[in-house]
Amino acid sequence: MAAPVLYGGAGGTATGPGDMRRSLMHEKKQVFAELRREAQALRVAKEARGKMSVWDPSTREGARGYREKVVRFGRQIASLLQYFENMHSPALDIIACDKFLLKYQIYGDIDRDPAFGENTMTAEVPVVWDKCEVEVKLYAGPLQKLMSRAKLVGAAREGIPNRNDVAKSTGWNQDQVQKFPDNRMDSLISLLEQMQTGQSKLTRLVKGFLILLEMAERKEVDFHVGNHIHVTYAIAPVCDSYDLPGRCYVFNSKPTSEAHAAVLLAMCREYPPPQFASHVSVPADAEDVCIVSQGRQIQPGSAVTLNPGLVYSSILTYAMDTSCTDLLQEAQIIACSLQENRYFSRIGLPTVVSLYDLMVPAFIAQNSALEGARLSGDLSKAVGRVHQMLGMVAAKDIISATHMQSRTGFDPSHGIRQYLNSNSRLVTQMASKLTGIGLFDATPQMRIFSEMDTADYADMLHLTIFEGLWLVQDASVCTDNGPISFLVNGEKLLSADRAGYDVLVEELTLANIRIEHHKMPTGAFTTRWVAAKRDSALRLTPRSRTAHRVDMVRECDFNPTMNLKAAGPKARLRGSGVKSRRRVSEVPLAHVFRSPPRRESTTTTDDSPRWLTREGPQLTRRVPIIDEPPAYESGRSSSPVTSSISEGTSQHEEEMGLFDAEELPMQQTVIATEARRRLGRGTLERIQEAALEGQVAQGEVTAEKNRRIEAMLSARDPQFTGREQITKMLSDGGLGVREREEWLELVDKTVGVKGLKEVRSIDGIRRHLEEYGEREGFAVVRTLLSGNSKHVRRINQLIRESNPSAFETEASRMRRLRADWDGDAGSAPVNALHFVGNSPGWKRWLENNNIPSDIQVAGKKRMCSYLAEVLSHGNLKLSDATKLGRLVEGTSLDLFPPQLSSEEFSTCSEATLAWRNAPSSLGVRPFAQEDSRWLVMAATCGGGSFGIGKLKSLCKEFSVPKELRDALRVKYGLFGGKDSLE
């Protein structure tokens, strides 16, 4: 053994181990500082921290100077794609997934020389994109100015001096314009004045794009055309419709296309339509929808199957017809945002002003250029989610700033609401400065912040801003004392004022991330987004260990006395009766909870030490058995110097008995302990070879473990994988999220997931459900499936048949009972009255309204049956039955037009005309005197179409006054020549 080497000497140049470690650490610090200075990400973070400015919402300080026009990405969706292509190309694809991760880095020590260590922390924020129900509130928004012809503008200002000019400008028939009554010209002038105010079609286009997004998932849906009013583009019908309130108008440039008419009607009515189940709610444009066209009208009651291509082409056609193509981009972005709504319960959109559609051909077409293209499913999701995140970040920045500055015990919601309602335009402008993505600039008519309430404020405080912070990396200005300011320009201080660091901790806590405070250095820090990642399960393969025989080798010049800690602590004197307790060494957690060995065996050779093999459930190791060394006893104390895991008993058993044992003699020598601490190169190489062999067998162990897990899951829950397969088949079949949940619930209640193991498509699922319904019925089901596809209709039919009392409507009950129906006609559906024309319930209602039910009218028809047929197949209301009964009482003809609406029927007169010729005894008159009411009705009603042949025959028999002759001349060309009856 070599003698110990001593280091000493006053003023000498010799160095010891401490000096070597100090110089090595100095080199490490230099290399670390050099590498950190060259880090590009850190350099960008420092520059961003210095450029960020703040604005105060209460005083508006800092908000000036940001109203100039700036060219920004994202004004159009194509520019949005270019922005992300430059920043992070796969980000849009990643955030379109239901689950994704946003990775951030928190840089510490950025304004001083960094301390050696981990100065940068990484946080991966998980985002599970679930949707929130949103309701659209309408407000009076700005109107788009229109370009009408010069003569129409003059007519609106100065009156109509020349009717021919009006006919030429509008394209109306000159004879009809000339014959239009003078007392009705005021309505035309008022209509032309209203035309000059403009139009507003954004909300209607938004509903169209919402339908398109739903159709992208469902592929094909059946829509019905009906329950609307048709207005022919002519002077009389246009003015008559203008005089009636509560109407909205939509211009149809393709009157022969039923698909185009179905899309236009759906865009005007409330969203969602009956065929959809959506979380978005948009009110209808008006109570009555009027289709204006220059051709024939669409017959009501027809059905048409729509697909995404037909819907998209109809939206573009309507936008070009009404000169509002400049709103397509804005409407598309708003629809995507509503479809992916996650943060807001209400938003504001402008009220639809559609009077322009009543006279579209009279105006000059403009803005006919189409912008943008149809979005794919994933891209529409990404655009909507980016818009939602931008709104969330802007709202939370102001709400959190106000909440943090409010005094404890006081409700800040009143101040937040007052500020957002009165300064929503300024807040929207400043929100667009948070990012280089100008989506907020592209949707100026969408109100978000002014529609928020207290529940929205509370919800924002429970959401982490890290869900949208990744979009504000190039922000130029943010709210003073807001979370963005604290996260970008943050500081961790040693004083009690830790507002910036507390915001970081709170936002990470809201994201379910636990921050390690000891790793965060004090001083300035900033937060930067790194990347977006797909959510995938992180599978950690278990470590398997294999024991191999290894010969221990130590260096010949090894001297354990150089270790100053080997001698151990000095023995301390204790009072009499006080037992000395051994100092407990640190024990790894795995050793404390290790299971006891199941088998022990010893092996020996002549030239190697003895080995003890210990086997447990997951660990097999071999440790050498060292002969017990001579005990070193002291006269004052017998405490051991060190303890080792190589003793004959396990360390777990040794540590558990430390506190109860008496002072024990030293169990091993210092040389043996240090020999095991310092292994030779040969030993290390053998250990490395053993580790590589263990990695080879790692794959087999992992595969066996996965097989056992799958077997266990299959035994415990057979539906583990079947439910996911059924969900995918339903999605491929065109069903939405809510519809898939309804189908899964129906499957659980009936056939079960296990019964659909061999199914490969939605058709197979439907067939299994049909077989189950025909065999056992759906008695346990109390709700119908949503949607209007062929699969849904068939299943709903079986559900209704199994539960007739639960799902039978009053209309179906009327159709089933017919003459035996005895219900209340006042609350019954009008379109089903023809089934119960002779029932006691219908006759009782007629008698209560003083209408004789059994008299013959309109060609030997009973009054009760005739009224039921007209009300069911026409557009009249039940309240019109009394007037209709008086009008047809005593008549021998049935000339009632089926297209006549309730409003048009209300203008009809019930007068009876006198005979034209005196009565004669030579023959019977061909008509009854009450039949003259059809002439009066044809002349006075605002719509409908009467047969000209019958009207001519009636004109020969009755004396028609001049006012009625003029009206019949304009509408039907009667009384036009010398022979007025030809």
UniProtKB/Swiss-Prot annotation:
Residues 592-613, 628-655 are annotated as: Disordered. Residues 597-613 have a biased composition (Basic and acidic residues). The keyword Metal-binding does not apply. Residues 635-649 have a biased composition (Polar residues). Disulfide bonds: none annotated. One of its GO terms (cellular component) is T=1 icosahedral viral capsid. Its main location: virion. The keyword Calcium does not apply. Keywords: Capsid protein, T=1 icosahedral capsid protein, Virion. It is found in: Virion. Capsid protein self-assembles to form an icosahedral capsid with a T=1 symmetry, about 35-40 nm in diameter. Homomultimer. This is Capsid protein. The gene is p2.
